[in-house]
Amino acid sequence: MTAQGNIYGINGPIIYLKGDSGFQMNEMVYVGTGRLVGEVIGLTSERTTIEVYEETTGLKPGEPVAGTGAPVSATLAPGILTSIFDGIERPLNAIQKESGCYIDRGIHADSLDTKKKWHAHMTVKKGDRLYPGAVIAEVPETRAITHKVMVPPDMEGFVLSVAEDGDYTIEEPLVTIQKKDGSEAVLSMTQKWPIRIPRPVSRRYPASRPLITGQRIVDTLFPLAKGGTAAIPGGFGTGKTMMQHQIAKWSDADIIIYIGCGERGNEMTQVLEEFSQLDDPRTGNPLMERTTLIANTSNMPVAAREASLYSGLTLAEYYRDMGYHVAIMADSTSRWAEALRELSGRLEEMPAEEGFPAYLASRLSQFYERAGMVQNLNGSEGSVSIIGAVSPQGGDFSEPVTQNTKRFVRCFWGLDKNLAYARHFPAIQWLTSYSEYLTDLSGWYETNVDKSFVEYRNRLVMLLNQESSLMEIVKLIGSDVLPDDQKLVLEIARVIRLGFLQQNAFHKDDTCVPLKKQFKMMEIILYLYEKCRALISMGMPVSVLKEEKIFERVIAIRYDVPNDRPDMFDGYKKQIDDFYNSVMERNA
């Protein structure tokens, strides 16, 4: 028997019921005659507090509230990929057919198509013992991704009957099992899972493999591990969304969950348009076939914004349990924190710093701690990597969301508006950014790319830091007073900035660069530095070295050397040797 109650008070998205109405904490409820979706967030003997995930305009005291007896849950089955949902996993395509461009209040649609038939290949037989997470069937969801239908994490038993291979809807029975207590359970392709509860795993692994993004400053200088967490803070116009789009397009994750949380609707439109036209470089299939979008844009109800991150995480953990590597793009966690602040204000809670609730840090940690490289219940290995954009007002990194986020992420890609306004993209400021995964991943780089990879990376960072120190002197008294070896540092740092850190998202070779090419580019830049330093130690001035235009040719490598032609780097070494010899001959 589900609980029933009547509205006693309304305060924006917050609804109050008088007395103890028999509801459970976090229970999903239907509010009012329009049956708006809500969730129980507070219970006392005097009143029940509910947050409503839809617009509450027109609700009146006395209207009924009906419980469902279950928490707010995500529907997990084939059909998630290529779909676009709102914050509580309602399909926007189906809603658009029913109510047009805007979501009507109280509209209900199945999260996934219950009429579409999927071809299921059964992987179990009668009499098999099934444990939690065991794969009972395989369904080709897209050309690149095989959906594995699993036993729910809270169920196990012996197989009593199995359906034949064939076409089934997501609700038709596939396997009947006998549980430990002797009762029978019917398994279909569909599972339900509460969005606020992490799905269980066997064990968690330390970081050991990088999430390769094709962006040089990320992969080489500040790498992110598979199963890791990263924050991209930056002011307005610094390129947070573009950075996340680039990672969503080119990273070597199997599946991308893109959560548009409180940002502009046009950004989601851009993802839909671009991803449908681009092909995955690994499989050759459209990028949209490995992507799911959760759109909770700035004009949608605030309460659903808070739920959208948990919905996306639950979908990601479901695919992780199949053995896939999933990357979540959350754009932006600041808008999510603002939703927490607004709801906290409605609940009349004591505000903390800048009006955010005192539990902001614990909510952020609940979100980021669901990332990780894990061994699943079925023995497979999967990961969830989280990349969260942070939008501090005025680009001030000392505000609470950025500061609390830094506590829970191990990778920090701070965007700089001065770099962005100078048209340097990605606008990641190399002096303030960091990655704590570098030591964990150094063994992987040395084994899979080159033994010198980490050493070269550290030398690049050292040169950039030297440039920063020298620029303070240059700003005061100019560069002419510097000795030639320091002038060379400034020139090589310019080559690193323009030829390595800067990247063109619209160039076919420069938009995504393989690690082998990244290493070769570092090698050439440092080879040029060593040769020039040798010349300067013999008394050659930097002005003579700059006459040959060798620095400009090295900067242009990113365009001139195709990604599939690493052999061309030998020609650049020869050019640098020829440059060295010609300078020696002319000044002998």
Give the residues covered by each predicted segment.
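Short histidine-centered loop motifs in beta-beta connectors
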Residues: 52, 57, 119-129, 159-167
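P-loop NTPase nucleotide-binding/switch module
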Residues: 97-153, 169-229, 243-246, 281-300, ...
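Metallocofactor- and cofactor-centric catalytic cores in central/energy metabolism, strongly enriched
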Residues: 45-48, 70, 155-159, 233, ...
